[in-house]
């Protein structure tokens, strides 16, 4: 579950903090209110593409951090394999952009953008207007079902339906 977003020096945002509630969270607002910038900051923290032009004009860097709480065994196993410490089931994704450089961190440990993307794909799936590609992937359907039941379906069932 996504718990918190922290953004600093990104586009028009000097600094912002958002706490998320359990369940569905919806960003709404007038045109130009900053919804796209917030989604962009999440994308940045998740390892997505971001332009250095997004760094606030009066700043040297932009920072985006997301805090998640998870008990998903496959995610915790992968973090253990990567030697990323996890306390209280919290996973903190952080990305700092300065000039042409990008520094990614998972729970304070420096990682590559590829690793950040791998872990983030196990934590969240962001869908904007007309963005639903992962829902078209049949393999993703089983992951979604497994996440709701907190069990992994028998591989034979998976093969029969994919």
Label every model-predicted segment:
Residues 4-7, 11-144, 151-159:
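Gly/Lys-enriched N-terminal cap/neck module of very large, oligomeric protein machines
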């Amino acid at each position: 579950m996504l718990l918190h977003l922290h953004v600093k020096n990104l586009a028009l945002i000097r600094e912002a903090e958002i706490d998320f509630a359990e369940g569905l969270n919806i960003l709404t607002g007038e045109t130009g209110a900053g919804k796209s910038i917030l989604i962009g900051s999440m994308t940045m923290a998740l390892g997505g593409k971001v332009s250095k032009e997004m760094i606030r004009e009066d700043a040297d860097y932009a920072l985006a951090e997301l805090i998640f709480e998870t008990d998903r065994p496959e995610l915790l196993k992968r973090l253990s394999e990567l030697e990323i410490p996890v306390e209280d089931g919290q996973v903190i994704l952080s990305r700092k952009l300065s000039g042409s450089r990008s520094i990614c961190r998972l729970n304070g440990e420096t990682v590559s953008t590829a690793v950040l993307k791998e872990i983030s794909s196990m934590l969240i799936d962001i869908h904007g207007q007309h963005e639903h590609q992962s829902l078209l992937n049949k393999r993703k359907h089983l992951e979604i079902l497994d996440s709701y039941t907190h069990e992994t379906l028998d591989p034979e069932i998976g093969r029969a339906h994919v």
